[in-house]
């Protein structure tokens, strides 16, 4: 696919568009969390468990990712486990720790809610050239790293 001409934009316009996207996503996360019977924080934690795949995270890993205390993440995991979203498994290398695994049926339920939106995003990506997709991927990856670093430096839980 050849790149379509795109309108010129300044960094300020791009940041404004990004702010609009983030705001819309925040509203969407609240709506989706309600649909699946979770809080936004619990849904975010579950998403990190899914993202980890076979590399099962510990409670400490999740606390760091969600930027909550280990005590708070215990409550999150208790709610997720009671609701059938996760299972806690003993850590094979450290008996004091547990690993967190997503329940396959819960993963399927959450993906079913997101699937129509991701299909639309896939259609949108199809309107861009491979080089443009590479730029988008690079920008999202670097912006995610920057955001995580900023959170680490400025927003640590007590």
Give the residues covered by each predicted segment.
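C-terminal regulatory/oligomerization modules of transcriptional regulators
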Residues: 1-6, 133-158
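N-terminal leader segment of winged-helix/HTH proteins
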Residues: 1-36, 83
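C-terminal ligand-sensing/allosteric alpha-helical core of TetR-family HTH transcriptional regulators
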Residues: 17-28, 45, 113, 120, ...
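N-terminal helix-turn-helix DNA-binding core of bacterial DNA-binding proteins
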Residues: 29-68
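Key DNA-contact positions within bacterial/archaeal DNA-binding proteins
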Residues: 71
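Charged, amphipathic alpha-helical coiled-coil/dimerization segments
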Residues: 79-134
């Amino acid at each position: 696919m050849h790149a379509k001409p795109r309108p010129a934009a300044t960094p300020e316009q791009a940041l404004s568009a990004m702010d609009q996207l983030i705001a819309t996503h925040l509203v969407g996360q609240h709506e989706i969390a309600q649909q699946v019977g979770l809080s936004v924080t619990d849904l975010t934690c579950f998403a990190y468990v899914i993202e980890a795949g076979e590399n099962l995270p510990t409670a400490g890993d999740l606390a760091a990712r969600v930027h909550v205390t280990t005590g708070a993440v215990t409550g999150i995991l208790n709610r997720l486990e009671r609701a059938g979203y996760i299972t806690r498994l003993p850590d094979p290398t450290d008996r004091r720790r547990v690993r967190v695994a997503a329940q396959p049926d819960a993963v399927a339920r959450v993906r079913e809610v997101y699937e129509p939106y991701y299909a639309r995003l896939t259609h949108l990506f199809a309107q861009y050239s491979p080089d443009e997709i590479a730029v988008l991927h690079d920008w999202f990856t670097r912006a995610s790293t920057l955001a995580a670093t900023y959170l680490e430096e400025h927003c640590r839980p007590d």
